[in-house]
């Protein structure tokens, strides 16, 4: 799959804050998700991200902005998100209606996902205790120590390699309102060193009582994750489960079928899988009669080299 620009955030359509010299009619501040970005390779651009962000705050009714998408802020290798986090924290008294932030809306044409340099992003959550949705793209340099946040409902990490330290930080966090959690775990080559053991506190249940959707996706150990999920107490409280984008084979599917019932789910996403046709049918036969929507689209492409079979996650570099 390809990583694309966000088209919406928090139920609001994305709108690109215009560059200097452009004067389109702007929508009401609370009606769109504002995307603020700069192009470091545009020789005609005369402002960096800090200047662009200040211009944004001065141009729109900042106190009415509900959703903010942070796009490219500089050259990927040379600029992590630390300065962006500081800008967001400094603006907390102006962005008093902010409910959703996505940090790193950067596509491969700008920088590969593994090139996006992040930082400790939790100061944003601490600065905005009323925030409801927070998403991050890029795992390099990403830090997420355990936090307490009473109102966050959606938390997502899109990476080609999510550090185990981040997974442990999420699992140790106090997020009583969290309903939706999505983590692209990625591959070890790009920093995705999380293990099933790192997921254990999360899967044990009790930490996030409001959680209704769990996505543990894009992993090269997707079979092991499926086996852990199959026995996880947390699953009983879920309405939907996403194990897509990873190297999920018949072994992982067999673990799901042999584990606890999944017939209470509204849907389960297993796309980008490596199932045999017979296993795919077994999954459908086990779940669809109970009304579970089963997504088995986009089978992964195997490659064979000198008798060895290679399987890949959907997103890595």
Feature names for model-found ranges:
Residues 1-82, 88, 92-95, 313-317:
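N-terminal alpha-helical scaffold/docking segments in eukaryotic complex subunits
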Residues 16-22, 48-57, 79-92, 112-123, ...:
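Leucine-rich repeat
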Residues 32-44, 69-76, 102-114, 130, ...:
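Concave beta-strand-loop units of leucine-rich repeat
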Residues 83, 285, 305-317:
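Short, surface-exposed amphipathic charged segments that create phosphate/polyanion-binding patches used
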Residues 87-88, 95, 100-105:
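Amphipathic protein-protein interaction modules
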Residues 96, 208-218, 226, 253, ...:
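Long, charged, low-complexity, helical-prone intrinsically disordered regions
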Residues 122-132:
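A broadly conserved amphipathic alpha-helix scaffold signal in soluble, globular proteins
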